[in-house]
C-alpha cells in the first residue's frame, strides 16, 4: 500500500493534500469530537456557535483563548513536516485543511488553504477589520488579556476568524479549494473523518475527474469508500515513511534520467 501510494505521488502532475483534525491530534491538540472535545463541562459544539457568542461572549472567548494557549504550546509533528517537505520537493502543490491551528505553516508549508479559518486571526462583528495576531506580534498579549477584545476601528466586539457550527465556509477559500481539486490528479487525504461538508467534497471532486485518492487514517472514514489506497495508521508514523519512499523513487528516476 505504501509503495503504491508513493508511486502515485511521485508520478503525479498536480497532487494536493486534504487534512483534518486527526493530523493535529498527534500534536496534542484536542479534537471537537469525543471526550477530548470537553472544556470545563461544555462540549465544544455548544460554544463554537454564533448563538453562544451572542449569549455569552466572555465564555466563548475564554474557551478560544484556552485553545489558543494549547496550540501555542503544540509543535508540528512528523506528518505536518512530511507534507511541507513534499511541497518543497514540488510533489504537492497545496495543502487544503479543515484545521484552524496554523501548524501546516509552522511546519513550512507555503500554499495552505484554510477552509475553517485560523484561530490566530480575529475579525470585527460589525466592520471589515481583521487582524492576524501572529503577524502583528500581539498573540501572547492577546491571550493574557482578560477584557473582551474590541475592534480598534469601530469599537465593536472582535470574534475568532473561524467557521462556527451553522455558519457557511468562507467563499474565497472554498472556491480556491474546489479549483485546486479540479486540477489535481492525486489527493492525499490525512486524518479527516470525511463527514463535514462542503469541505469533504474535495476528494470527491478529484475522484470524479479521474484522479487518485490516497487516504492515511487510524480508522475508516467517509472518504474510505472512494480511496484508491487506504493506509491505516497514525499520520505521524505513516507520512515520514511515505515521504522516504517518494524520495527514493524520484532519486532513482533522476539517476536513470
Swiss-Prot record:
Domain of life: Archaea
Compartments where found: Cytoplasm
GO MF annotation, one: zinc ion binding
One cellular component term from this protein's GO annotations in UniProt: cytoplasm
Essential cofactor(s): Zn(2+)
Active site: 116 (proton acceptor)
CDD domains, per the entry: SIRT5_Af1_CobB
Keywords: Cytoplasm, Metal-binding, NAD, Transcription, Transcription regulation, Transferase, Zinc
Cofactor note: Binds 1 zinc ion per subunit.
Binding site for NAD(+): 20-39, 98-101, 191-193, 217-219, 235
E.C. numbers: 2.3.1.286
Location, primary (coarse class): cytoplasm
Binding site residues for Zn(2+): 124, 127, 151, 154
Reactions that this protein is recorded to catalyse: N(6)-acetyl-L-lysyl-[protein] + NAD(+) + H2O = 2''-O-acetyl-ADP-D-ribose + nicotinamide + L-lysyl-[protein]; N(6)-succinyl-L-lysyl-[protein] + NAD(+) + H2O = 2''-O-succinyl-ADP-D-ribose + nicotinamide + L-lysyl-[protein]
Disulfide bond residue pairs: none
Function: NAD-dependent lysine deacetylase and desuccinylase that specifically removes acetyl and succinyl groups on target proteins. Modulates the activities of several proteins which are inactive in their acylated form. Deacetylates the N-terminal lysine residue of Alba, the major archaeal chromatin protein and that, in turn, increases Alba's DNA binding affinity, thereby repressing transcription.
Domain notes: 2 residues (Tyr-64 and Arg-67) present in a large hydrophobic pocket are probably involved in substrate specificity. They are important for desuccinylation activity, but dispensable for deacetylation activity.
Name by which UniProt lists this protein: NAD-dependent protein deacylase
Amino acid at each position: 500500500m505504501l509503495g503504491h501510494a508513493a508511486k502515485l505521488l511521485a508520478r503525479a502532475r498536480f497532487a494536493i493534500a486534504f487534512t483534518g483534525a486527526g493530523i493535529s491530534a498527534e500534536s496534542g491538540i484536542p479534537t471537537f469530537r469525543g471526550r477530548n472535545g470537553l472544556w470545563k463541562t461544555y462540549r465544544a459544539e455548544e460554544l463554537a456557535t454564533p448563538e453562544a457568542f451572542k449569549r455569552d461572549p466572555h465564555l466563548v472567548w475564554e474557551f478560544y483563548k484556552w485553545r489558543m494557549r494549547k496550540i501555542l504550546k503544540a509543535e508540528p509533528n512528523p506528518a505536518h513536516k512530511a507534507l511541507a517537505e513534499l511541497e518543497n520537493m514540488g510533489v504537492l502543490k497545496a495543502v487544503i485543511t479543515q484545521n484552524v491551528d496554523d501548524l501546516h505553516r509552522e511546519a513550512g508549508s507555503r500554499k495552505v488553504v484554510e477552509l475553517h479559518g485560523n484561530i490566530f486571526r480575529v475579525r470585527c462583528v460589525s466592520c471589515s477589520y481583521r487582524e492576524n495576531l501572529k503577524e502583528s506580534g500581539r498573540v501572547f498579549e492577546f491571550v493574557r488579556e482578560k477584557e473582551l477584545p474590541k475592534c480598534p476601528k469601530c469599537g465593536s466586539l472582535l470574534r475568532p476568524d473561524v467557521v462556527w457550527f451553522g455558519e457557511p465556509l468562507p467563499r474565497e477559500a472554498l472556491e480556491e479549494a474546489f479549483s485546486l481539486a479540479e486540477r489535481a490528479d492525486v489527493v492525499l487525504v490525512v486524518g479527516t473523518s470525511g463527514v463535514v461538508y462542503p469541505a469533504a467534497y474535495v476528494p470527491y471532486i478529484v475522484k470524479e475527474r479521474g484522479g487518485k485518492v490516497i487516504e492515511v487514517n487510524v480508522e475508516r472514514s467517509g472518504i474510505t469508500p472512494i480511496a484508491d489506497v487506504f493506509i491505516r495508521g497514525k499520520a505521524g508514523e505513516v507520512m515520514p515513511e511515505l515521504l522516504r519512499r517518494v524520495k527514493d523513487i524520484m532519486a532513482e528516476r533522476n539517476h536513470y534520467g
